Amino acid sequence: MSNNKRLCIMKICITSQGSTLDSQAEERFGRAPFFIIVDTETGSFEALVNQFAGGSGGVGPKAAQLIIAHEVKALVSGMVGGNAREALLAAGIDLYAYRAGGTVRDALDRFNKNALERVA
């Protein structure tokens, strides 16, 4: 991916176990308790509660619609299921893998340094 495209990204989502940048990143997209939405231009963020995390099935596509509604341009997560992946890609959201077991802040730093693998 070209650096020009990365510079255009303004809002990214990082899956999280908590509501702050110092929370542990969550590897599961649909089951993540929180989505941290970061504006890479201003550095501001908001924490969204994933109301679908405890659902019995089909949580990934529902969570994807929540992220899409927030006009995110990239998602940083460990694993994204097939149906959620299709919905996110159809919406033009780039997917990046983060499986380091660190914090949301670490995932964000790696994203900003182009150190994450783009998986789709």
Q: Where do the model's predicted regions map?
A:
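Non-catalytic interface/targeting segments
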Residues: 1-58, 62, 69-70, 89-120
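Short, glycine/polar-rich helix-capping loops at beta-to-alpha or helix-loop-helix junctions
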Residues: 80-86
